[in-house]
Amino acid sequence: MPTSKKLKDALAKVDRSKSYTLNDGLELVRSSAYAKFTETVDVAVRLGVDPRHADQMVRGAVVLPNGLGKEVRVLVFAKGEKEKEARDAGADFVGADDLVAKIQEGWFEFDTAIATPDMMGVVGKIGKLLGPRGLMPNPKVGTVTFDVGRAVNESKSGKVEFRVEKAGIIHAPVGKVSFETDKLKENILALIDALVKSKPSAAKGTYIKKISVSSTMGPGVNLDVSDVSSQVI
C-alpha cells in the first residue's frame, strides 16, 4: 500500500533515540508529513504531576500567537445585550433555550462553547452532552464570562484549552504543517509558558518531563526539554 510506504519513509527519517532541538524537530515534522490534506501539528507534554490528586490537576487555556490555521466555530449562550455583543464579535451561533433544544436533539456543529454566568442554569441541562465532548463552558478556561466579546475573539484567534490526562500528559494542537517553522515555534513556546505558569504548588521534582511533536499522520519526534525550556520567556 502506498500509504504504508509513505509512513515507513517518514519513520525512517526520525531517530527515536534522539531528542531534537525545537527548530530541528519542527523541520523534521514538517518534512515528514505525507497526507493529502494539510496535517495538524500536535504537541504532547508529559508533566511531573499525579492528576489523581486534585491539588495536582493542570488545566487552563492559552491564545496561540499565530492561531491554529483553521476556522473555529463558536457558540455562545447569552441573552439581551450580551447576545448582541457576541454576534458583533463574530460568534457563529448565539442563543439560549433554542440552542439547548438543538443540542439535545444531537446537533454539535461547533468547536467551542461560551456562556455568560447567568446562563449556566440553562446550560447545565446539557452538561452530560457537552462534558464528554470537551465543550462544556468553564470559568477556569475563560469560557464562562460576561466579557463575551473578548472570549469570542480569543476563541476565533486560536485559543487552545489544555487539561492533564490520567497519565500526566497534556495534548494540544499548535498549528498546521503549512505554517512556517518560526510560527509553530512561537505557538509551542506560548503553550509551554502557559503550562509552566499553571504548575500546581503540590507538584514536586521535574515538572516538564518530556515533549514530543508530531503531525496528524506522522511519527512522533522527541524534543530536547532543556532546549525548549531555555527559550520560554
Curated annotation (Swiss-Prot):
Q: Which ranges of the sequence are coiled-coil?
A: none
Tell me the InterPro entries matching this sequence.
Answer: Ribosom_uL1_bac-type, Ribosomal_uL1, Ribosomal_uL1-like, Ribosomal_uL1/biogenesis, Ribosomal_uL1_3-a/b-sand, Ribosomal_uL1_CS
The protein's matches in SUPFAM superfamilies, at most eight in alphabetical order, are given as: Ribosomal protein L1
What cystine pairs are annotated? none
Q: Name one Pfam family in it.
A: Ribosomal_L1
GO process terms (BP) = regulation of translation; translation
- MF term (GO), any: tRNA binding
Q: Which domain of life is it from?
A: Bacteria
Q: Which UniProt keywords apply?
A: Repressor, Ribonucleoprotein, Ribosomal protein, RNA-binding, rRNA-binding, Translation regulation, tRNA-binding
In terms of CDD domains, this protein maps to:
Ribosomal_L1
Q: Which GO terms describe its cellular component?
A: cytosolic large ribosomal subunit
Family to which the UniProt record says this protein belongs: Belongs to the universal ribosomal protein uL1 family.
Q: Describe the subunit structure.
A: Part of the 50S ribosomal subunit.
PANTHER family this protein is in?
A: 54S RIBOSOMAL PROTEIN L1, MITOCHONDRIAL, LARGE RIBOSOMAL SUBUNIT PROTEIN UL1M
Q: What does this protein do?
A: Binds directly to 23S rRNA. The L1 stalk is quite mobile in the ribosome, and is involved in E site tRNA release. Protein L1 is also a translational repressor protein, it controls the translation of the L11 operon by binding to its mRNA.
Protein name per its UniProtKB record? Large ribosomal subunit protein uL1
Question: What is the organism of origin for this protein?
Answer: Geotalea daltonii (strain DSM 22248 / JCM 15807 / FRC-32) (Geobacter daltonii)
